[in-house]
Amino acid sequence: MRSQYCGALNASHINQEVTLCGWVDRRRDHGGVIFIDLRDREGIVQVVFDPDGKDNFALADKVRGEYVLQVTGKVRARAAATVNPNMATGEIEVYGTALTILNEAQTIPFPLDSYANVGEDVRLKYRFLDLRRTEMQNNLRFRGKVTSAIRNYLDRHGFLDVETPILTRATPEGARDYLVPSRTHDGKFFALPQSPQLFKQLLMVAGYDRYYQIAKCFRDEDLRADRQPEFTQIDIETSFMSQDQIMAVTEGMFRELFKDLMNIEFEEIRHMPFSEAIAKYGSDKPDMRIPLELVDIKDLVTDVDFKVFAGPANDPKARVTALKVPGGNEKLTRKQIDDYTKFVGIYGAKGLAYIKVNDKSDLEEGLQSPIVKNLPVPVRAAILERVGADNGDLIFFGADKHKVVTEALGALRCKLGADLNLYTAQWAPLWVVDFPMFEEDDKGGWTSIHHPFTSPSCTPEELVANPGAALSRAYDLVLNGVELGGGSVRIHSPAMQQAVFKILGISPEEQREKFGFLLDALSYGAPPHGGLAFGLDRLVMLMVGASSIRDVIAFPKTQSAACVMTDAPGTVDELQLRELHIRLRNQKKEQPAADAPEYGM
């Protein structure tokens, strides 16, 4: 139906006859000459119809926005005065000699202009129109280039693309599963995979050595800007490779991706222990573009007559920390400080103490703060020295339980970086390593930091003796404060796997019921293996500069995990429910389509 794409035409096509197909982006009637901007996925070209072609001109006069056209004409150079430098095809136009209206279009509910202020709910309701916008077209085309480049890299490095099951069984991986009732197995359910984790490990046991998959995964969890109930991850697993080797081959892929697609070259990516990330940046995914650090001052305030500091300073589970903002005296108003005090309250902080350094040589009168009178002069001097304060700086303080201070000041650090535009680079990748194996839950038990298949850096006996001290052989790749993904060396010994299950409170009976197939596989000569997974949606979101992963997914769900275009999830008829042996409990007469039904057997 066509000979060229609209956006692919250029001066080399002058005097050639072409046939184009596309949508009407804009139509203009200038003194008896009709101009139509015809759009396809490659771009826009101007088509001209004049009264000399009587039938075509009459037809062009009927054309409206978003009509679908087929146009035949001759490419010609534009007059110098009409060249449009803002269009890739701005030097040429097509003089139309034939026109066919392939389909008409109703008036669209919102303009497709890139700068149109359209609510996201409307965009998602008419996603098939929203996807026509240049921004969305560019995002999805770029996403395709990313997946193609990843496949090419992994293929070259000997990885095999293997699909794993979508219908599987529920396993504890940290989030709620999406369950699928079985019609043929009364009372039983499949689960949609949160990741291909166990299957890719089994492929290593089976001897496939290097596996990858662009995998669809599902998690029934609360949504944020960078979360979706169904998402895509770049899943990788290898055998007979050390942690450093796995990280190196992955880093090579990451660096090649940015160089080839964005002309950005990264130096070797820094490795940072988890403990340093938490201590200095208040996060296990620190944004290294921000030149602010948390500084612990607990030892300096243990004996002060100021309970706000002294209490946490003498509590082994608490933390007293300073965060210096260079030049903060002039940059931050009292109202902003009050706003930041409210902000840290989101993370459980009871307040936000601060000191303004007006003259550090005068420790009596040169410091401005509601709390400074509670700190002896030697303590003031020690704090200024430790944080490296200069005149004009402002120092924030956090004093509370370790988790509260870490999260509150870590978040404040990121907010200050954004609000004051403190970024020192456009991109800052980082490997975070040496994670703890476990963390304590609210009931005093242990939960896995990553997942229960991560290998520790110690023996099973040492692990059981002191779970809280054990470090894992895990690693996360962080970019600009966003966790792109992570992985670990896996457990390949049945004894070690059973030791981890025991620490997590999984009984031998439950181990056999839920993980018997894995324990069996590990007992039949499982090789040392490890891998990782990247969130493709998050990666593309960062690379194109989108504010949400919904802008890099063709048909995403809303913040409430619904599709407003198809009204999914929806109700099903009684016959289907009976076939699945399901009865709805507390069913409403008119249940909104976006509400998930509550299942009861």
UniProtKB/Swiss-Prot annotation:
Its main location: cytoplasm. L-aspartate binds at residues 173, 219, 450, 490. The keyword Transmembrane helix does not apply. It comes from Cellvibrio japonicus (strain Ueda107) (Pseudomonas fluorescens subsp. cellulosa). This is Aspartate--tRNA(Asp/Asn) ligase. GO terms for molecular function: aspartate-tRNA ligase activity; aspartate-tRNA(Asn) ligase activity; ATP binding; nucleic acid binding. Keywords: Aminoacyl-tRNA synthetase, ATP-binding, Cytoplasm, Ligase, Nucleotide-binding, Protein biosynthesis. InterPro entries: Aa-tRNA-synt_II, aa-tRNA-synth_II, aa-tRNA-synth_II/BPL/LPL, Asp-tRNA-ligase_1, Asp-tRNA-ligase_1_N, Asp/Asn-tRNA-synth_IIb, AspRS_core, GAD-like_sf. HAMAP family: Asp_tRNA_synth_type1. PANTHER family: ASPARTATE--TRNA LIGASE, MITOCHONDRIAL, ASPARTYL/LYSYL-TRNA SYNTHETASE. Its EC number is 6.1.1.23. GO terms for biological process: aspartyl-tRNA aminoacylation. It is found in: Cytoplasm. GO terms for cellular component: cytoplasm. CDD domains: AspRS_core (cd00777), EcAspRS_like_N (cd04317). Aspartyl-tRNA synthetase with relaxed tRNA specificity since it is able to aspartylate not only its cognate tRNA(Asp) but also tRNA(Asn). Reaction proceeds in two steps: L-aspartate is first activated by ATP to form Asp-AMP and then transferred to the acceptor end of tRNA(Asp/Asn). The record marks 30 as: Important for tRNA non-discrimination. The keyword Protein biosynthesis applies. Pfam families: GAD, tRNA-synt_2, tRNA_anti-codon. Residues 197-200 are annotated as: Aspartate. Belongs to the class-II aminoacyl-tRNA synthetase family. Type 1 subfamily. NCBIfam families: aspS_bact, PRK00476.1. It catalyses: tRNA(Asx) + L-aspartate + ATP = L-aspartyl-tRNA(Asx) + AMP + diphosphate. ATP binds at residues 219-221, 228, 483, 535-538. Homodimer.
